[in-house]
Amino acid sequence: MAKYIKYLSAILAIVLLSSCVKDELNPNSQVIDSSVKQNEFDEWLSENYVLPYNIEFIYRMEYIESDMNYYLVPAEYDKSVQIAKLMIHLCLEAYDEVTGSKEFIKTYFPKMIHLIGSAAYRNNGTMVLGTAEGGLKITLYMINSLKLEADYLNEYYFHTMHHEFAHILHQTKPYSSDFEMISGSDYVKDTWNDVYKTDEAAWQAGFITPYGSSEANEDFVELLSTYITSTPKFWSDMLTAAGKTGSAIISQKFDIVYNYMKNTWKIDLDDLRDSILRRQGEIDQLNLDTI
């Protein structure tokens, strides 16, 4: 998919758009300069991203890589260091752990991660959390608002990362066509944020998130990314809140997601979730501020 977005009120979007034009560039933000010298962080990225995973991690905002339809601010250096370390611990190494090596990520994960400091707001009241382009590049926004809290990290960064990666996996090896038939004509395309105002409303209709109701591929990856970043209690409570009809639909679709990952990629989503949740509990133990 091209863009993963989160619904916000139109009023909030207008206020933020009107105020951001007055902001001055933070001196800690990084804009690309072709003559810039490699620093300690660049060397660390080479050792921890390029060499083991063949992933280019771009924290200096490159205009050629940025969406010029939005007013964007570069990512701050300190926040870039933090998210780079968190991404390895909470995402890349979790897959390494359950697959037994770095080869899975090296082969299938996008080859470029691009950071943007600010959010990207649309005129219709939605906010872009991340974008993916052809399975080769993921752009993450709101880096300057980074908070070291698991729920916040999942909502604004890692749910998006797993969502976009899941797209690459199903585009590489398709899932069963039976999945799309379950909700069939219930998908609402671009009107999802008008049709489902709350998660609970989407659950009761058989969708794990309002955005998952847009079309089958989004439904598939939303199920996967929500499951592996959520606690078993959340999942159980969600199914209860979904009611008899909604929970049956969600469970039927998730069985296909689970078996697809197990049989096609040899990844048990329960094991992956356990690894991610355990690693989330280790955030306070990480040295995120120094290279």
Regions from the PLM with identified roles:
Residues 1-8:
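Bacterial N-terminal signal peptides that target proteins for export
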Residues 24-25, 81-136:
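Auxiliary, metal-adjacent structural segments of Zn-dependent hydrolase domains
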Residues 187-271, 279-291:
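Metalloprotease/metallohydrolase-associated module, dominated by Zn2+-dependent proteases
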Residues 20-99, 247-291:
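Acidic/polar, low-complexity intrinsically disordered N-terminal segments immediately downstream
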Residues 15-19:
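C-terminal motif of bacterial Sec signal peptides marking the signal peptidase cleavage site
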Residues 155-176, 221:
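Active-site recognition of the HExxH zinc-binding catalytic motif
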Residues 142-162:
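Short pre-active-site segment immediately N-terminal to the catalytic Zn-binding motif
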Residues 95-113, 172-173, 177, 234-242, ...:
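Surface-exposed patches in mature extracellular/periplasmic domains of secreted proteins
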